[in-house]
């Protein structure tokens, strides 16, 4: 039943009756034929927009590569469709040609079988550029009737169906891979610019390094180098005054605050320049005290020393005044152990100066005592010459009174000299104590006690020959403040002789 229906349908379709027809062999069976050839082309997909009124082109390349270009209708928007594939030769396949006009049937051999597939270049480009249009293409093709055409075309050959499925699967896999890669790229791209990676431990390492190095060096160096600027220059008086003022008031606080370099340099300059200045300032002050020879002026001298002892700041101001008057300024060479030698040299200079000043004061006192004694002797002689009694007892009483007055004056002068010596010794101890307080961190703490003791010993050694010399030069008064017997006897003899002369 099925066969008859197919035959009937084929006979009806070709308009062939049940009669027997003659079959002719075509030119392809002729071995000398070189101009006629028949080929078959199988497409995996034929779009509905193909324009059948125009000719297609076939290009055969090397290695049996074939490119078929089929024109499309103008309404499709695509000028042509390109197919690419390969060819292979037939061995036993033939082609039967039926001529409707004559009714003749001819058999021809097939030379090559060409199988091509539609290239996905344009479609892939569209999928990459405009993915929305590719999603809408199956609906348009279904509306135009292209989808039913695509279904039976794979049925023409057994090998074309898996190829079509593979092609669609490849496209889907490509889109999946592309979307997956895009998602992966987006996932990888977000952490790169995300704040989580900015706060990662790899980047804060240089951020933590820069604050640890920069403030430690800049702050410490600035604090250590700034105070040393006025100490370097020799001509800067303002820097020296500031250094002396700071050393006089806050050396101990500066060293306790953690600046040993500044305290040591300022104190060293204070000591070095304090000991350079006294040749001018201290000498002038001693000359001023020597000029005030009366006892009242000498009594003012201990009061000045007492004021200097009570107010340490006045002594520092006097030292600054002496430093301004001093023409020589030396740079402090002292860092470390080099301070011990200049201190010993300066201390010896101060001892010499103080000894000279004490010697000058003692000489002035000797001159005053000598003048007072000469005046008393002259007055006693005048009194003895004017007296008419002539008695030795009256002369002796007058001489005793004059000698007692001189002894009292001499005792007062000795007490004043002793007070001057004690006040001077006290001020020297005060200066030594100030030096000891100003040098807490120089390692010179052991020098100041030795300095005070050596100062006292040297002063005592220098005062002993001076006292001996004073005793030898004076020779006028005894050790207890009175006059010796020889002088009294000579005075009595002179008074008696003068009285005898008056009697004669």
Swiss-Prot record:
Residues 174-218, 242-504 are annotated as: Disordered. GO terms for cellular component: nucleoplasm; super elongation complex; transcription elongation factor complex. Promotes transcriptional elongation by Su(Tpl)/ELL. Essential for development. PANTHER family: ELL-ASSOCIATED FACTOR EAF. Residues 383-398 have a biased composition (Acidic residues). One of its GO terms (molecular function) is transcription elongation factor activity. It comes from the Eukaryota. Pfam families: EAF (PF09816). It comes from Drosophila melanogaster. Disruption phenotype: Loss of adult progeny and reduced male-female sex ratio. The modification Phosphoserine is found at residue 194. InterPro entries: EAF_fam (IPR027093), Tscrpt_elong_fac_Eaf_N (IPR019194). The keyword Magnesium does not apply. Component of the little elongation complex, at least composed of Ell, Eaf, Ice1 and Ice2. Residues 174-184, 248-271 have a biased composition (Polar residues). Keywords: Activator, Developmental protein, Nucleus, Phosphoprotein, Transcription, Transcription regulation. It is found in: Nucleus. One of its GO terms (biological process) is wound healing. Belongs to the EAF family. The keyword Zinc-finger does not apply. Disulfide bonds: none annotated. Its main location: nucleus. This is Ell-associated factor Eaf.
């Amino acid at each position: 039943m099925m066969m008859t229906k197919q035959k009937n349908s084929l006979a009806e379709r070709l308009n062939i009756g049940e009669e027997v027809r003659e079959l002719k062999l075509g030119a392809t069976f002729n071995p000398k034929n070189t101009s006629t050839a028949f080929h078959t082309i199988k497409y995996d997909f034929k779009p509905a927009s193909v324009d059948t009124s125009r000719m297609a082109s076939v290009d055969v390349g090397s290695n049996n590569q074939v490119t078929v270009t089929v024109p499309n209708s103008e309404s499709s928007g695509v000028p042509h469709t390109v197919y690419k594939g390969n060819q292979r030769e037939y061995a036993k396949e033939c082609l039967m040609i039926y001529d409707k006009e004559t009714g003749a049937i001819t058999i021809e051999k097939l030379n090559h079988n060409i199988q091509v597939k539609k290239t996905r270049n344009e479609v892939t480009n569209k999928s990459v550029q405009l993915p929305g249009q590719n999603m809408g293409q199956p609906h348009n093709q279904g509306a135009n009737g292209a989808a039913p055409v695509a279904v039976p075309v794979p049925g023409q050959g057994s090998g074309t169906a898996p190829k079509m499925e593979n092609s669609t699967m490849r496209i889907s896999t490509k889109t999946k891979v592309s979307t997956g890669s895009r998602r992966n790229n987006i996932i990888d791209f977000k952490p790169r610019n995300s704040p989580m990676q900015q706060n990662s431990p790899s980047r804060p390492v240089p951020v933590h390094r820069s604050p640890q190095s920069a403030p430690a060096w800049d702050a410490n160096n600035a604090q250590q180098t700034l105070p040393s600027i006025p100490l370097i220059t020799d001509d800067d008086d303002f820097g020296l005054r500031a250094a002396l003022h700071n050393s006089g008031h806050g050396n101990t606080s500066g060293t306790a605050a953690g600046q040993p370099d500044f305290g040591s340099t300022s104190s060293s300059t204070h000591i070095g320049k304090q000991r350079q200045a006294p040749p001018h300032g201290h000498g002038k002050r001693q000359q001023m005290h020597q000029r005030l020879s009366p006892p009242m002026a000498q009594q003012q001298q201990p009061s000045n020393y007492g004021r200097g002892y009570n107010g340490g700041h006045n002594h520092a101001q006097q030292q600054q005044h002496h430093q301004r008057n001093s023409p020589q300024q030396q740079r402090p060479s002292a860092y470390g152990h080099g301070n011990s030698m200049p201190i010993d040299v300066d201390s010896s200079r101060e001892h010499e100066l103080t000894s000279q000043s004490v010697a000058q004061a003692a000489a002035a006192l000797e001159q005053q005592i000598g003048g007072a004694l000469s005046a008393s002797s002259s007055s006693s002689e005048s009194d003895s010459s004017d007296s008419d009694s002539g008695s030795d007892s009256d002369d002796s009483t007058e001489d005793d009174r004059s000698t007692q007055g001189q002894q009292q004056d001499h005792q007062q002068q000795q007490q004043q000299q002793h007070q001057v010596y004690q006040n001077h010794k006290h001020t020297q101890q005060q200066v030594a104590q100030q030096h000891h307080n100003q040098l807490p961190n120089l390692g010179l703490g052991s020098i100041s006690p030795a300095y005070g003791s050596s100062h006292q010993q040297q002063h005592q050694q220098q005062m002993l020959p001076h006292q001996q010399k004073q005793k030898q030069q004076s020779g006028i008064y005894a050790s207890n403040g009175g006059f010796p017997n020889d002088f009294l006897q000579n005075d009595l003899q002179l008074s008696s002789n003068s009285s005898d002369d008056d009697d004669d």
